[in-house]
Each structure stands twice: as C-alpha cells, then as structure tokens.
Amino acid sequence: MSSYSTRQVGAANTLDYKVYIEKDGKLVSPFHDIPLYANEEKTILNMIVEVPRWTNAKLEISKEQKLNPIIQDTKKGKLRFVRNCFPHHGYIHNYGAFPQTWEDPNQSHPETKAKGDNDPLDVCEIGEKVATVGEVKQVKVLGVMALLDEGETDWKVIVIDVNDPLAPKLNDIEDVETHLPGLLRATNEWFRIYKIPDGKPENQFAFSGECKNKKYAEEVIGECAEAWEKLIKGESVDSKGIDLTNTTLSSTPSYSDAAAQEIPSASPAPAAPIDKSIDKWFFISGAH
C-alpha cells in the first residue's frame, strides 16, 4: 500500500492555507492522481478527507489550482465556515471526496433530473475516529443520499473506514440503522438545514430523502468515474476551468512530471484563531 502524506503551506484558518498531497514523497493531485480504488477486487476505495468531523472550516479540494491542494473556501474574500445547527457542532461526519470522480455539470441524472455540481463525489465517513485534513482513508461504500443543492445534484456517499471496529458489521445501508440507530436521520437533517444560518433556504433531497443502498451508490460512483475519465482525457464537452495537471497519468494531455517544482515547499504554521462567533449555536424550527 502506498503511503500518503501531506505538505502544509501556511496556517489553517487563513487565506494562504494549502494542503498538498504527497505519495511516497512525490506530489500528486488528490483529484486526479490518487486511484479511486485501493483494492478493486474487494471494493475498497480511497477517500480524501477535506473536513474532519466536528470542525467548521469549509475546506475543499481546489479545482482551479495546480495539483488541486485542499484550501478553505471563501465568499467575497472572506473565509467560509459551516455554522453550528443545534444539536450539531460543525460537520457531522469526516467529510471529503473520492479521487478520480467528477459530478459532470454537462449531464442531467435521469432520476434526480438535475445536473452534476462540478465537484469530485462527496463522501461522509461515519467511523469513530476523527480524521485529519488531507488524510487518505481506505473505505467501504454503504449507500448514498442525493442532495439537490441550489438546483444541482450533489450526491453524498456514506462510507466507513475499513479499519473501524464496526466495519466488518456494516456491509449495506440497512446495517447502518441496525448498528448506528439515528445516524442516517441525523445526517439527512444536517444536510437539509446546514445552510439556513447563512440565510439560504433548506436543501431538498431526491428520493424523499431516502438513503439508497450500496449497489445504487456503486452505480453512481461508476458514472462519476466515467465522467472524470472523459475529463482527464480532454474528451469532456466543457471542463469548467478545472486544472487537470497530474504527475502520474503519463498518457493524459495534462501530465507534467515537472509540475511539482512549481509548488511551494512546506511551511506549516500554527492555526490562526477562529472568530468566537463561529461557536454560536443556531436553533432551527423543524429540526429535530
């Protein structure tokens, strides 16, 4: 198994913060270079953690920057944080993405009737350990929810770290309710309400909020992997400004072994303090 590590540039909670991913000491793109499958035969997938559970900073893989570092999202030049919707604190799960997947905004999904959100596929890891930013976890797929976020299909794949003590008992979505009662309902609620404190309407779900099973989730992952394959080969209708630079896929047009030389060396700094207002709890009527 390859060993992944992170290269931190700047301090967390600042505009300069970037977390690059290295594989065996070589810089790679978490979007394009890390394989989707850690073990295809056993259906074990790689997941990149963007946001550890119970934290608020809205971190995400940058689609536009070379080698796609994890950065904090901004709005009007200000750092974005997810607010605390009672009784939750920050993100409800370890949150991240599947590499080598793309929710194609040029395509409508036949069942959700909405186009992709132009991101790698979102993943919620429900194990007991709080992850770290840029950690590459090996996970098994359990199911998927279809959020309709401002008119776009935004799949949320539910997974568990293969090393979690509960992993052997969780093999499909119904096992989650058996062993982690209330988790799926709380996850649905959190995604429904988490933007309300920012003055946005509650999010809607396809399938009446139902979490689809493992088989359905694997079909969604397959579709998004195919869409990424077209994207990286330069065959997509519109690549939407995504930086496709990679350091391992030598047969693709955007392969560049030299790209790593343009990336700053590690300069980790202690995290900057977060404004105390981010600690506030928001009470939302209709939430349970």
From Swiss-Prot:
The annotated region (Disordered) lies at 252-271
Return the EC number. 3.6.1.1
Which PROSITE patterns did the record assign? Answer: PPASE (PS00387)
Q: Which residues bind diphosphate?
A: R80
Q: Which cofactor does it need?
A: Mg(2+)
Q: Which Pfam families match?
A: Pyrophosphatase (PF00719)
- Residue positions annotated to bind Mg(2+) 1 are D117, D122, D154
Repeat: present as a keyword of the record? no
Which reaction equation describes what this protein catalyses?
A: diphosphate + H2O = 2 phosphate + H(+)
> What are the entry keywords?
Cytoplasm, Hydrolase, Magnesium, Metal-binding
Task: Identify the GO cellular component terms for this protein.
Answer: cytoplasm; fungal biofilm matrix; hyphal cell wall
Q: Does the keyword Cell membrane apply?
A: no
* GO process terms (BP): phosphate-containing compound metabolic process
Identify the residues that bind Mg(2+) 2: D122
Give this protein's Gene Ontology molecular function annotations: inorganic diphosphate phosphatase activity; magnesium ion binding
* Listed Low complexity bias regions: 258-271
**Compartment(s):** Cytoplasm
Q: What else is known?
A: Has antigenic properties. Elicits a specific immune response in systemic candidiasis human patients undergoing malignant hematological disorders.
Query: What family is this protein classified in?
Result: Belongs to the PPase family.
Give the protein's recorded name.
Answer: Inorganic pyrophosphatase
Organism per entry: Candida albicans (strain SC5314 / ATCC MYA-2876) (Yeast)
Task: Provide the taxonomic classification.
Answer: Eukaryota, Fungi, Dikarya, Ascomycota, Saccharomycotina
